[in-house]
Amino acid sequence: MITLKVNDIEVTVPRGSTILQAAEKAGVFVPTLCHDKRITPYGACRLCVVEDRKKPGNLIPSCFTPARDRMEILTETPAVLDAVRTQLQLILVNHPLDCPVCDKAGECTLQDLVIRYDIAEAPFGTERFARYVDRRSPLIERDMTRCVLCGRCVRICGELQGRDELEFLHRGYKTVVGTDGGRALDCDFCGLCVSTCPVGALNDKLFKDRTRVWKIRKEASVCNHCGLACRADFHLEEGRLRRVTPAAPAAGEKGLLCARGQFGWRAFESPSRLGTPQVRRDGALREAGWDEAVNHAAKALDAVRRSHGAESIALLTADHLTTEEAAAWAAFRRDTLGGGPIGSIQAGGYRRILEILAGARGARVAGGTPRDLDEAEALVVLGGGAAELHPVLKPLVNGWMRKGDKDLAVVSSWPDTLTRRATLPLTVAPGLVEEFCAELLEALGPERTKPPAELARFGIDSCALARLSGREGTTLACRYSDGPRLYLFMPFLLDEAAGRVAVQVAVTEGSYFDTTAKTTLGWVVAAPEEPAAPRRDRPQQTGGPPQKRPPGGAHRHIGLDHRASL
């Protein structure tokens, strides 16, 4: 750790932090246009300059300059303010003053900086270079007349999404951002470039010209297109959804959404969706109120239960139940109906995995977070199509692998996006991925083997993995026999069987539903624990299935987020 002063405010930051990060921790504003916490510093805009009191007159770009111990940084000296104003005036030379018709007005970083630094006129006049507006994409409009060449869209596409769809074209005064050959966008349409653009150069076509940002209010929520539960901001105008944007990244997060999350919101307002309950009368479905529909269903179920018993009523769950819905469904089955079988459309090969989890003795299976992936040395993806089912996983893995010597293993029956990047692609026969995963979980179980002390903290027993009946687990065990910090990701449980597993665990085991957990990305499998005193920081359970302490000591904690993701 190092200690320095920013505008006479003392702040301590980890060694290797930049001056800009130190200023942010001290609560001191430093202007930027090209900086985005999700990507590497670039230093293109030169607005973030600061001055070192010990070296007066020497302006330092704070976004990529490492902070040093006992520095004394000043951000509002006359030299700094003059440099910032001059740079803003130079940027405005080729930026049109069309704020009244620009969709970015009201949330434009350049507009905010011009007002903050009182830029009343642009003294540097020159003939504007005629750029272009590309409207060929169905979702993203690129208006290069407003581009300030900060490079954020170019870098975020390459560093996180791994597509390098955008690049700098030409040189000098004629430099523009575009695609190779000037073609239309042909990418994943993740919307990262739109979310990072500080001006109105990249626009969401579903939102453009439909309203103004000061007329909408933001509601923090999560995307519900898959089980990753990415945090998102829903922009509403008079109760109508206008757009969805990634939420500001918190610690350990990247602030990501995929194409479905950012541009698929119109599905929520489809006229084909049911808006009110319907009750069948005289052979036809007719709209009804909620009270009438609930009473109608209750009478029908009660009549069947009285005539044929509770076991005659089978419950079939949906695959995208939230944790709260799963808990309510389980309570309804247990307390109201008094029993009855429960199942899901996607039972498949997941039953054995559920049985292994339900039969664990003292094992702790906890939900992971992006922070866990950042700290991992190795990532094992169990099941194919992870990036296709959950597109946000792709930029997460790309960003993780750029941080150094990382090991990616993918167990799949077919090549997919992550398989092409894997350092250890493992192929199993179609239909046997679930069987392989079950064998892996069984090998990790405390009843089967006891992990060596040096590997216990990783929850991995490589010796047990090597005994997986000649399956690819042997290769996996040899690969990680030195005990790297391993992170497991099981995409199939996040989607098809998540609801069923959640309900089954709730019904058969009464396990704790951790609805306060952060976003769950996968499973971090830990070693058995010794019995411990109850945690004082855990909130008291107010509803849902009762908690049980399984045999063998430690409480089995199955971490679920509110998208029912294990």
Where in the sequence are the language-model features?
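Eukaryote-biased recognition of intrinsically disordered, low-complexity regulatory segments
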Residues: 1-7
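Conserved short loop/turn motifs at secondary-structure junctions
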Residues: 10, 33-38, 143-146, 176-185, ...
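A basic, amphipathic helix-loop patch mediating RNA/tRNA/ribosome contacts
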Residues: 19-53
